[in-house]
C-alpha cells in the first residue's frame, strides 16, 4: 500500500507548496480534507489518524492542538512546520545536514520539527564551526537576514501585493523583530550550540521568494585565529557529499560583485559562501536559499522522504 500523507493546513502558503510538490508523486496517497471542513476538529482528527505521515502547516497553537488530537495514536508520524516544537527534546530537528547521524535520527523519528527558514541558513553557517571547535560557544554571534515576503504567509503576501489592502506595505525593504525577541532565536541558539543568545536582525524585501542570511565574524575571536581558507575548509568538509547544501569555492566567491537573494527561488538547494580578504581578520559567512524551498516546504518533503526511506 502507498503511504498516506495528510497536509493539515494545505491551503496556506507552505501547505500549498508541499501539495504542489507531491502532486505528481505516484508512490504516495495524499489525503485531503475539504476546505470547507478544515475547522471541523473531529474530521481533522480522523484524517490525522488515517495518515502514515501528517505534515502540519499551521500556526503554533493549531499545531499543538493537532498533536494533541493524535495522543494515543502513535502510528501517525508527524512533521511540524511551525515553531512550536523546534526546541523540544522529544522532537528530532529536521535539518538533515545538521550533523553526523542527523539523517538517521530524522528517518527513525516519529516526531520531526521542520526548521525555520532563517535558522536553516544561520545554523548551516554556525554549527560546523562550533562542531569543529573554531567558534567559541560564548562568541557574540550576529545574524542579519532578508527574506522574500512569502515568508510572512498569506497575510503579508496580500499586504505587499494588494494596494487596496487596509494594511498595505509600500516599503521595498523593512526591518522587523526590532526588540530582538524574534521567535527563531531559541532555535538558533540551541541548534547552533551557542551559550550566548545571538542577535538576530531579520528583514523583508519586495520579492516573493528567496533569502540571504549573513553571519559576520572577527577571526581574532575564533579559536587559533583561523584563515579564511581554514573556515572554508571546515564548511566544505562538513557538507562533503551532500546534494542539497553546497559550499561555493573561495575562488568563485572572490569573483562575485554581488549576491542575489532570488538566485535560488523555486529551488530546494542552499549555497554557502565565505567572503573576506585573507589577512584582514574578518569573514562574512553567507547562506543563499529559497525561504519556501530549503527554508520550508522543500525541507518538509526532504524529511518526509527520509522518514519513508526514500532517500
Curated annotation (Swiss-Prot):
Reactions performed catalytically: N-acetyl-L-glutamate 5-semialdehyde + phosphate + NADP(+) = N-acetyl-L-glutamyl 5-phosphate + NADPH + H(+)
Family matches, as SUPFAM superfamilies: Glyceraldehyde-3-phosphate dehydrogenase-like, C-terminal domain, NAD(P)-binding Rossmann-fold domains
PROSITE patterns: ARGC (PS01224)
Keyword Oxidoreductase in record: yes
Entry's localization field: Cytoplasm
Primary location group: cytoplasm
InterPro entries named among the record's database cross-references: AGPR_AS, AGPR_type-2, NAD(P)-bd_dom_sf, NAGSA_dehydrogenase, Semialdehyde_DH_NAD-bd
Keyword Magnesium recorded: no
One annotated GO molecular function: NAD binding
GO biological process, one term: L-arginine biosynthetic process
Active-site residues, Swiss-Prot/TrEMBL: 117
Biological role stated in the UniProt entry: Catalyzes the NADPH-dependent reduction of N-acetyl-5-glutamyl phosphate to yield N-acetyl-L-glutamate 5-semialdehyde.
PANTHER family the record matches: N-ACETYL-GAMMA-GLUTAMYL-PHOSPHATE REDUCTASE, CHLOROPLASTIC-RELATED, N-ACETYL-GAMMA-GLUTAMYL-PHOSPHATE REDUCTASE, CHLOROPLASTIC-RELATED-RELATED
Family the entry assigns: Belongs to the NAGSA dehydrogenase family. Type 2 subfamily.
Name used for this protein in its record: N-acetyl-gamma-glutamyl-phosphate reductase
Organism, scientific name: Brucella anthropi (strain ATCC 49188 / DSM 6882 / CCUG 24695 / JCM 21032 / LMG 3331 / NBRC 15819 / NCTC 12168 / Alc 37) (Ochrobactrum anthropi)
Amino acid at each position: 500500500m502507498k503511504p498516506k500523507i495528510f497536509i493539515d493546513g494545505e491551503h496556506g502558503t507552505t501547505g500549498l507548496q508541499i501539495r504542489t510538490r507531491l502532486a505528481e508523486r505516484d508512490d504516495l496517497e495524499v489525503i485531503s480534507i475539504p476546505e470547507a471542513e478544515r475547522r471541523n476538529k473531529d474530521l481533522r482528527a480522523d484524517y490525522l489518524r488515517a495518515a502514515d505521515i501528517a505534515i502540519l502547516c499551521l500556526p503554533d497553537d493549531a499545531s499543538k492542538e493537532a498533536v494533541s488530537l493524535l495522543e494515543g495514536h502513535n502510528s501517525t508520524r508527524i512533521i511540524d512546520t511551525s515553531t512550536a516544537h523546534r526546541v523540544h527534546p522529544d522532537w528530532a530537528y529536521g535539518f538533515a545536514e545538521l550533523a553526523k547521524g542527523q539523517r538517521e535520527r530524522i528517518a527513525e523519528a516519529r516526531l520531526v520539527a521542520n526548521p525555520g527558514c532563517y535558522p536553516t541558513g544561520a545554523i548551516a553557517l554556525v554549527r560546523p564551526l562550533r562542531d569543529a571547535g573554531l567558534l567559541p560557544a560564548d562568541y557574540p554571534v550576529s545574524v542579519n537576514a532578508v527574506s522574500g515576503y512569502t515568508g510572512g504567509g498569506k497575510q503579508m503576501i496580500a499586504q505587499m501585493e494588494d494596494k487596496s489592502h487596509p494594511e498595505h506595505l509600500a516599503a521595498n525593504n523593512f526591518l522587523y523583530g526590532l526588540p530582538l525577541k524574534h521567535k527563531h532565536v531559541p532555535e538558533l541558539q540551541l541548534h547552533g550550540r551557542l551559550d550566548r543568545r545571538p542577535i538576530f536582525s531579520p528583514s523583508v524585501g519586495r520579492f516573493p521568494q528567496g533569502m540571504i542570511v549573513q553571519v559576520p565574524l572577527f577571526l581574532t575571536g575564533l579559536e587559533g585565529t583561523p584563515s579564511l581558507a581554514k573556515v572554508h575548509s571546515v564548511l566544505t568538509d562538513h557538507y562533503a557529499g551532500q546534494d542539497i547544501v553546497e559550499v561555493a569555492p573561495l575562488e568563485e566567491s572572490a569573483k562575485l560583485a554581488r549576491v542575489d537573494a532570488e538566485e535560488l527561488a523555486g529551488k530546494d538547494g542552499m549555497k554557502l559562501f565565505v567572503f573576506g580578504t585573507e589577512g584582514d581578520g574578518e569573514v562574512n559567512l553567507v547562506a543563499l536559499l529559497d525561504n519556501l524551498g530549503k527554508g520550508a516546504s522543500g525541507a518538509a518533503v526532504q524529511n518526509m522522504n527520509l522518514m519513508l526511506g526514500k532517500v
